[in-house]
């Protein structure tokens, strides 16, 4: 199952109903924790996310509201006896801060450090793009390998059924019939994660073609001057980003405490700029599924296991 669990939605200052940042993405047996701010360990308990579910931790940058929850999370993993390797991705210029946070954590986690810079793959299916903030910041893009969708009508016409469908999928051909003859391309799902940034090319690349896009929306459109001063997005700019990338679902978060606990008006500002996108103003402990790829129009279809392209990168 592919699902986003929102652990916190505040920006620099938490509120009575909004914890600091924190986002857990369950993705086919992987568990990616993004930007754990203060209190993330407790929010995980409320959300039912176990420390052992985490396989990767991804930091966009080392401002405190995006990383000060790291010691608590690592200490809980050590307490729970998590044995699998945990990969930690973060900007290389934040290495001193990250190592200090690790130093005050309980030992015992098999933690693999992956400082990064530039743009491109950092793990299989996981890429980064630079953003525009006051310190070095990166967004993340998680992609599923492209696959194909088998069409039952074409399979029937080719005389392929039952176990032969799986055999064709594995082998690529059966006699004169190829996978391409009885299926159509199915682009893999895409998840984009964009935190503190002003509008920039990297953000546009991360948003492009996403099924689920999580982006900061620190300020209202009425406070565009503050967004420009501090290099953040307004709700309307987040909507424009989703519209330019044809994102299917936009999740707004990282709200300034100046707006209180109701961020629905920010969703309205974003929705006005992205009429073709589902816009959600996130609340703490929301669970948001990654939208399934739409079935082809005009032909009955059933999904096949992904075949084909994979991203290469070090783990």
Residue ranges and their predicted role:
Residues 4, 35, 44, 61, ...:
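Divalent metal-coordination and catalytic microenvironments
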């Amino acid at each position: 199952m592919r699902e986003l669990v929102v652990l916190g939605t505040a920006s620099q200052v938490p509120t009575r109903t909004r914890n600091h940042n924190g986002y857990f993405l369950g993705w086919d047996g992987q568990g990616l924790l993004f930007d754990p701010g203060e209190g993330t360990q407790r929010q995980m308990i409320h959300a039912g996310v176990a420390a052992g579910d985490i396989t990767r931790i991804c930091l966009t940058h080392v401002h405190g509201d995006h990383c000060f929850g790291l010691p608590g999370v690592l200490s809980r993993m050590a307490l729970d006896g998590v044995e699998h390797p945990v990969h930690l991705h973060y900007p290389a210029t934040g290495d001193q801060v990250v190592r200090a946070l690790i130093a005050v954590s309980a030992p015992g986690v098999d933690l693999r450090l992956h400082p990064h810079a530039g743009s491109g793959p950092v793990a299989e299916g996981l890429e980064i793009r630079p953003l525009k903030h006051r310190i070095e910041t990166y967004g993340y893009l998680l992609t599923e390998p492209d696959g194909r969708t088998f069409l039952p009508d074409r399979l029937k016409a080719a005389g392929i059924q039952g176990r032969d469908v799986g055999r064709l999928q594995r082998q690529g051909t059966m006699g004169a019939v190829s996978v391409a003859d009885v299926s159509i391309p199915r682009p893999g799902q895409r998840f984009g994660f964009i935190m503190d940034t002003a509008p920039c090319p990297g953000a546009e690349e991360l948003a492009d073609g996403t099924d689920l896009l999580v982006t900061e929306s620190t300020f209202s459109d009425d406070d565009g001057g503050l967004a420009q001063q501090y290099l953040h997005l307004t709700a309307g700019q987040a909507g424009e980003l989703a519209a330019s990338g044809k994102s299917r679902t936009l999740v707004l978060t990282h709200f300034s405490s100046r707006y209180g606990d109701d961020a629905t008006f920010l969703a309205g500002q974003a929705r006005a700029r992205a009429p073709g996108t589902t816009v959600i103003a996130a609340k703490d402990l929301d669970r948001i599924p990654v939208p399934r790829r739409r079935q082809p129009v005009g032909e009955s279809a059933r999904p096949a296991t992904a075949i084909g392209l994979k991203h290469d990168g070090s783990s």
